[in-house]
């Protein structure tokens, strides 16, 4: 039996004025341009990833079922509850009393919660299950 995981949710604090420097033209993955040495602006990560503060939450990934989508154990998800669920979107779902993060696959008679790791099986959700699509994942923040 799979161990149940608990997600801990956090609210964004967009009032925080702790902006950090952002290289204005991006970081070159090839040869850098000397002309771009001093093009910098300030950015708030909360303001950059939060579009609807009242409906946005953060949660950490627990497990390996979504590694193929770039969601690794311990990554921080940005979740927007105001977005409509759509086929192919990655969503945080509450299924039969447990939270999970999976890719949505909407069929005519059911919803499939698709893992992005072949070691995990898709979960078919139908009228016999309790399903709440809690929010849509919009960004993932990770350590490198």
What are these regions (language model features)?
Residues 79-86:
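Short acidic low-complexity segments
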């Amino acid at each position: 039996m799979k161990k149940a995981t608990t997600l801990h949710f956090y609210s964004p604090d967009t009032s925080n004025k702790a902006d950090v420097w952002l290289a204005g033209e991006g970081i070159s993955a090839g040869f850098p341009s000397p002309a771009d040495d001093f093009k910098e602006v300030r950015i708030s990560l909360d303001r950059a990833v939060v579009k609807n503060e009242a409906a946005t939450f953060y949660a950490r990934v627990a497990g390996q079922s979504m590694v193929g989508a770039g969601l690794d154990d311990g990554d921080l998800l940005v979740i927007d509850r105001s977005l409509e669920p759509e086929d192919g979107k990655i969503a945080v779902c509450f299924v039969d009393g447990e939270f999970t993060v999976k890719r949505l696959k909407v069929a005519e008679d059911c919803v499939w919660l698709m893992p992005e790791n072949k070691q995990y099986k898709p979960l078919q959700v139908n009228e016999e299950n309790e399903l709440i699509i809690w929010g849509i994942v919009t960004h993932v923040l990770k350590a490198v």
